[in-house]
Swiss-Prot record:
InterPro entries registered for this protein in UniProt: DUF1328
Keywords tagged on the record: Cell membrane, Membrane, Transmembrane, Transmembrane helix
Lineage summary: Bacteria, Pseudomonadati, Pseudomonadota, Gammaproteobacteria, Enterobacterales
Membrane-spanning ranges: 4-24, 27-47
Species of the source: Yersinia pseudotuberculosis serotype O:1b (strain IP 31758)
Gene Ontology CC entries for this record: plasma membrane
Cellular localization per UniProt: Cell membrane
The keyword rRNA-binding is assigned to this record: no
Top-level taxon of origin: Bacteria
Protein name: UPF0391 membrane protein YpsIP31758_3502
């Protein structure tokens, strides 16, 4: 998850340097979404823990 966030962040930075505002905004938004989803999944797994059967 975090890997995808970093990839989208790099794409946004490159697009911003080249002046593609729409593409940079979209990639930055996607990076934020992936990051937030990753944090939420991490917190859920942290609180629920591994269940032993």
């Amino acid at each position: 998850m975090f890997r995808w966030g970093i990839i989208f962040l790099i794409i946004a930075l490159i697009a911003a340097a080249l002046g593609f505002g729409g593409l940079a905004g979209t990639a930055a938004w996607a990076a934020k979404v992936v990051f937030v989803v990753g944090i939420i999944l991490f917190l859920i797994s942290l609180f629920t823990g591994r269940k032993r059967l």
